[in-house]
């Protein structure tokens, strides 16, 4: 009898231990696919090869793995630059996008899309707002807490940002890094004028994509900034999450910390954005793409800044995507190929420091 009771208690402990190890939820992450039906060629800086056709193959591999994982991801974060700007040279942008979305549609899991510079090389904001890349539209239908813009409209001055909660006490906040940007605005808009004038003030180079000689290297045309209206909106969401004691992941195409990317890849007004994020104890992570080599840092306040390797510059023999396992006290990244495995513990609000 004693032996049977002992075995029963041991089995119960094993079951409880296994249950404790199960994550609250998981989600997939992939960045900078930049698909095009084009031959391989060097990137803009001539420092790395771009594998245009293979990027679609890489996506197929990622989708197959997510589909067969024992714990199905609740959603996938697509961190921007889904197709490459080179598609505009032969008017193949729509065809290229359809090919990528066709593969994504094979996975019965919601994709959340952020918009990067290559989205705006290929399409207007008006087009993007009406496309499948507007994952905000779906959230608007199921969650009345989703933010759209300062006016709640998708007009030419609005920004593409929203938030959602996949599990109690967790929230994802997708922000628009090209809210202020000449490439993301119609030339007739007020934000275009503001963005272009700011860029010219900070960057006197003839080639506005060049950071040569700049004191603030982030002020190049392929980056963008966060407007005061979007900053106010972000502030309100984070303040609400602080009160609810939520854990918030901020998601953007552009990184925001100088140790998580080259300075020439950061949001224009990253010091302002970073300072605001660090002041809110709810923020636990910042997920971005854009800097294709990928990078990671934990800032002094305890926020984990993860910049994911770009699929477009991943050699055919490797991979670049990951799955995040979210627990009560930590998040565990299972990376593939160029994306490293990481165990990331949440910051302690009692020991918060603010600093870059």
Curated annotation (Swiss-Prot):
Pfam families: Metallophos (PF00149). It is an enzyme of class 3 (hydrolase). It catalyses: CDP-choline + H2O = phosphocholine + CMP + 2 H(+); ADP-D-ribose + H2O = D-ribose 5-phosphate + AMP + 2 H(+); CDP-glycerol + H2O = sn-glycerol 3-phosphate + CMP + 2 H(+). Keywords: Hydrolase, Metal-binding, Zinc. Its cofactor is Mg(2+). InterPro entries: Calcineurin-like_PHP_ApaH, Metallo-depent_PP-like, MPP_ADPRM. GO terms for molecular function: 2',3'-cyclic-nucleotide 2'-phosphodiesterase activity; ADP-ribose diphosphatase activity; CDP-glycerol diphosphatase activity; manganese ion binding. Zn(2+) 1 binds at residues 32, 34, 81, 292. Its EC number is 3.6.1.13, 3.6.1.16, 3.6.1.53. Zn(2+) 2 binds at residues 81, 117, 253, 290. CDD domains: MPP_Nbla03831. Belongs to the ADPRibase-Mn family. Hydrolyzes ADP-ribose, IDP-ribose, CDP-glycerol, CDP-choline and CDP-ethanolamine, but not other non-reducing ADP-sugars or CDP-glucose. This is Manganese-dependent ADP-ribose/CDP-alcohol diphosphatase. It comes from Xenopus laevis (African clawed frog).
